[in-house]
Amino acid sequence: MIWHVQNENFILDSTRIFMKAFHLLLFHGSFIFPECILIFGLILLLMIDSTSDQKDRPWFYFISSTTLVMSITALLFRWREEPIISFSGNFQTNNFNEIFQFLILLCSTLCIPLSVEYIECTEMAITEFLLFVLTATLGGMFLCGANDLITLFVAPECFSLCSYLLSGYTKRDVRSNEATMKYLLMGGASSSILVHGFSWLYGSSGGEIELQEIVNGLINTQMYNSPGISIALISITVGIGFKLSPAPFHQWTPDVYEGSPTPVVAFLSVTSKVAASASATRIFDIPFYFSSNEWHLLLEILAILSMILGNLIAITQTSMKRMLAYSSIGQIGYVIIGIIVGDSNDGYASMITYMLFYISMNLGTFACIVSFGLRTGTDNIRDYAGLYTKDPFLALSLALCLLSLGGLPPLAGFFGKLHLFWCGWQAGLYFLVSIGLLTSVVSIYYYLKIIKLLMTGRNQEITPHVRNYRRSPLRSNNSIELSMTVCVIASTIPGISMNPILAIAQDTLF
C-alpha cells in the first residue's frame, strides 16, 4: 500500500515537472530555438541507435552535422533582433551571446568530420561520442546566454561532465584514465570554489541571482566594496580560471591533451575556451562593475603568467599534443587582453575576432595531427622529420596553421594579434602588450623549429611506421582532409580582409 502511494506521488510529480517544462518550451521555446534543434537531434540519435544496427553508422554523422548546421542557420536568422530575457530571467538573448554561440557551433561542426576516421580506426562507440559532443555543445550554448548564477553554474557542469567522459573515452589507455581522473578531480574542486564565490555574491546582494539585479542589490546593501565581494571575486576567478586554463590553473591541460583521443582534444581546446570567455566577460563586467580595478589586476597577472610560462615551456616539449597544450595556455593570455580592455577600445571585438581565427588555426593543426597519427601511430615531434617528402599537402597545411598560430604575416593569426595588441596599447596596457609581443616571438621560434623539421629534417632513428608512411591522395573523400582544408583556408584568407569580421564583432555589445 505504501509503495502504491509513493508510486502515485512519483507519477504526479513527474507529470507536473513535464507539464511545466512543456509550458516553458511552448511560451519561451522560440527564444532558444537553436538549442531546441540540438535537443531534437539528441533525441533522434538516441531513437535511431536503439532501433538500428551498426550498418547505419553514417546516418549518425549526418544527423549530428545536419543538426549543428540547422542550429547555426537558426542562430543567423535571429541575428540583430532586440535583446530578450526569457525563462524568468535565467536566459538572455542578444548579439554578444549569439556570436559566442555561433563560435561553439562552428567548433562542433568542424570537429565531427575531423573525428570520423579516428572513430572508425579505433572502433570507438560512435553514438555515445556524438551524444557527448552535442550535449557539451548544448551546455556551452546555454552558458553563453546564462543570465543568473544558477544557470552560470549548471550550464558549465553540463559541458564539463561531457568533457570528462570524452577525455576518458579510450578506457584501455592508461594515460587516458590518468588524464580523466586528474581532469575530474580538479574540475570538481574548481566547481566548488566557483559556487562558493557565487554564494558570496548571492549573500552580499541581498539574495539576488540575476546578474543585473546583483548590481542593484549591491548598491542597495552598500556591499559593493565589502571584503565579501573580494572573496567572491577571487573564488570566481579561480573557478573560471580552470575552464580557461591560464597559468597557474593549467596543471590539468598538458596531461588531458596528451592522454585524451586527439579529436576530443581538438574539440575541448576551442569550445571550452570560447564558452569560458563568454561567461568571464559577463561575470566580470556586470556583477563586478564596482571592482573593475581589482579584476583587471587579477586578469593582468594571469595573462602575464600564461604568456610567459605557456610559451617558454612549449619550447621543451617533445610531444606534439603537449606542445599545443602549452601553446594554448599562451594563446589564452592574448585573449585575456581583450577581456581586460572591454568595450572601451574594441577589446571585445578584437577578442572575438582572434577567437574565430584561433578556432581555425587550432583545429587545422589538430586535423593534421589526427591524420598523421592514424597513419603512423606516433605523436613525437621528431617523427615529423621530412614529412614534406612523404605528404606535401599535409606538411604544407600543418606549416600554414603553425605559422598562423605564431602570428606571421600575412596569415590570419598576424592580423588577429595585431588588432588585439593595438587595442591593448590604446587602453594603456603597455607592459601587457610588450610581454605579448615578446612571447609571440618566442612562439614563432618553436613553431618554426617544427616547420624546419617538416621541410628539411631527416631523422636517423625514424620509426618503421613513419618510414612506411602512406601518402594521402591529392583528392580524397576523407573527412579529415575536408576539415583540414576548411581550417587552412580560414587561417590564411580572412587575415587579408578582416574588416567585415571586425565590423560584425563590434556590433555585439551587450
Swiss-Prot record:
The catalysed reaction is:
a plastoquinone + NADH + (n+1) H(+)(in) = a plastoquinol + NAD(+) + n H(+)(out); a plastoquinone + NADPH + (n+1) H(+)(in) = a plastoquinol + NADP(+) + n H(+)(out)
Going by the UniProt record, its keywords in alphabetical order are: Chloroplast, Membrane, NAD, NADP, Plastid, Plastoquinone, Quinone, Thylakoid, Translocase, Transmembrane, Transmembrane helix, Transport
GO terms assigned for molecular function: NADH dehydrogenase (ubiquinone) activity; quinone binding
Q: Which residue ranges does UniProt annotate as crossing the membrane?
A: 24-44, 59-79, 99-119, 124-144, 149-169, 183-203, 229-249, 295-315, 323-343, 354-374, 395-415, 418-438
Which EC class, in a word?
translocase
Tell me which Pfam families the record gives. Ndh2_N, Proton_antipo_M
**Topology term for the membrane:** Multi-pass membrane protein
Question: EC number(s)?
Answer: 7.1.1.-
Major location category of this protein: plastid
Task: State its location(s).
Answer: Plastid, Chloroplast thylakoid membrane
Q: Which residues form the signal peptide?
A: none
The family database entries (InterPro entries) matched by this protein are listed as: NADH-Q_OxRdtase_suN/2 (IPR010096), ND/Mrp_TM (IPR001750), Ndh2_N (IPR045693)
Q: Name one GO biological process term.
A: photosynthesis, light reaction
Q: Which GO terms describe its cellular component?
A: chloroplast thylakoid membrane
Q: Where on the tree of life does the source sit, at the highest rank?
A: Eukaryota
Q: Which family does it belong to?
A: Belongs to the complex I subunit 2 family.
Assembly and partners? NDH is composed of at least 16 different subunits, 5 of which are encoded in the nucleus.
Query: What the protein does?
Result: NDH shuttles electrons from NAD(P)H:plastoquinone, via FMN and iron-sulfur (Fe-S) centers, to quinones in the photosynthetic chain and possibly in a chloroplast respiratory chain. The immediate electron acceptor for the enzyme in this species is believed to be plastoquinone. Couples the redox reaction to proton translocation, and thus conserves the redox energy in a proton gradient.
- The protein's name: NAD(P)H-quinone oxidoreductase subunit 2 A, chloroplastic
Give the species.
Dioscorea elephantipes (Elephant's foot yam)
Gene (name only): ndhB1
